[in-house]
Amino acid sequence: LASLKAVLSTGSPLLTQSFDHVHADWKADVHLASISGGTDICGCFLGGIPTLPVRRGELQGPMLGMDMAVYTAEGAEIRGVAGELVCRNAHLSMPVGFWGDDDGSRYRAAYFERFPGIWAHGDFASHQHSGGFIIHGRSDTTLNPGGVRIGTAEIYRQVEKLDEVVESLVIGQDWPPQNPNDVRVV
């Protein structure tokens, strides 16, 4: 591991324990960078920047050419609190559309409906005052038990405040099975 310079983590926010494990058991001076992007753009919105400090639980900043911010539901930019991760500029890896979506309506609905002209990626995030970002989970994963819309990130935020909880998963389950109009959150 002597020649190891960087480790990139992706898929979900890196747990504090995993961050500490890499530095304690792999290599203390490795550049450990969490990244966030998507298969739809074949790239990253946020990630590791070798010239910036690495902070446990944070992604260091926007990748080259990405004008990233966090918005409230009303479209105002916010710092230090959670909201919707957005990209405010066109970029080279944006898909130009969806296959079979001749009028572009599905494409616009997927990314640009929430904030016209601005890519909303579907991640619940906060832009820290340090400049880094924290990804809290998906914002577009919504449960709808009894007609009440609940974002899974809202539940994760509360559950993860408990020291006893290391990992959690939130799903909607039809309950009882013979009554599909009733959903319990597990």
Residue ranges and their predicted role:
Residues 72-75, 129-130:
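Residue-level recognition of short loop/turn positions
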Residues 62-63, 76-112, 150-151:
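Conserved ATP/PPi-binding loop(s) of AMP-dependent carboxylate-activating enzymes
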Residues 91, 96, 106-109, 117-186:
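AMP-binding/adenylate-forming catalytic core of the ANL superfamily
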